[in-house]
UniProtKB/Swiss-Prot annotation:
Family: Belongs to the class I-like SAM-binding methyltransferase superfamily. Protein arginine N-methyltransferase family.
EC main group: transferase
Protein name: Arginine N(omega)-methyltransferase
Enzyme Commission designation: 2.1.1.381
UniProt region (Disordered), positions on chain: 1-24
Reactions catalysed: L-arginine + S-adenosyl-L-methionine = N(omega)-methyl-L-arginine + S-adenosyl-L-homocysteine + H(+)
Superkingdom in the source lineage: Bacteria
Source taxonomy: Bacteria, Bacillati, Actinomycetota, Actinomycetes, Kitasatosporales
Biased composition (Basic and acidic residues): 1-17
Amino acid sequence: MRHVQEARAVPAEHEARPAPVTMPANGSPYRLGAALLQSLAQEMNALAEQASALLSMPPESLSLDADAFAQIARRNVPRWHFAMLNDTERNTALMTALERGIPAGATVLDIGSGSGLLAMAAARAGAGRVFTCEMNPLLAEIARNVISAHGMSDVITVIGKPSTALDPVRDLGGPVDVLVSEIVDCGLIGEGLLPSVRHAREHLLKPDGIMLPSAARLHGRLVSSDEVLKLNQVTTAGGFDVSLMNTVATRGHFPVRLDTWPHRFLSEAAPLVEFDLARSALEPGERPLALTATADGEVQALAVWFELDMGSGITLSNPPDNPRSHWMQGWVPLDKPVPVKAGETLALRLGWSDFTLRVSI
């Protein structure tokens, strides 16, 4: 049985939090916060210096091989773009979905241009006009060049803005017929799928418009892995207590390729939540879960993966047994491990914000 999203506010007592850390007598959470801001300022200053070095170069000597350009590009464009573009299973599914789902002559908005791949696929599928938006200026310019090299600039327009900043009339000439929004991470929502679709559905898509994907589901299993736990938690090292590092541990879900780490599943796979992208509110919320343990053990997290409904019977998913997918699985940690016995039902609460999954007892 599938569970449709119940959108309601998340009570504070159900928010997942890392284990409390004892501050030393000469320490202060305010000093940690100030140090965090200082770290951000230093990173921004370093980027500004590299950008200034690029801008000071004569245009004729500016090269893509320049060290300053390479440094900025490394920080600015995540490496997963390459794995994604080389994911044949993903590409084939999306191309087929666009070919079957886009009516001839339709106006299409693609959220998140990247290299321009999906915008070009939409044009090839028969769209009359394609708009694609990209908030990263470097990627937007790459997409423009790739699209131009394929002779599609007369059909495709790249807009250097996030979708939430688009003006439906000024930028798009009116609401579009089809919305393409494959902006998902290992846990579905980490790239802002929910707020982006929520906004686009209300402001950028015609009332009877087509959404690709039209629905998204999360599946999951109870899981235990001391090795994965160590990726985001520490107590001692070399005989010293370094647990204060846990203040910078990831809160909520993070990516793990489960088949590369020793782990034990402690339940069968189960549907966790479904988002009807065309009709559901898509607001932050939570829902109860009841998962039955299949073995004795200590539950440390929920392992989660998504399933996108692309229409025409086409789905896109990243389960643990699919090594072909470039997407990893999501690891949603519990605050504390919970011992279970085989046959015991564990009651949990799954919560989601616009960007993060959390689970609590």
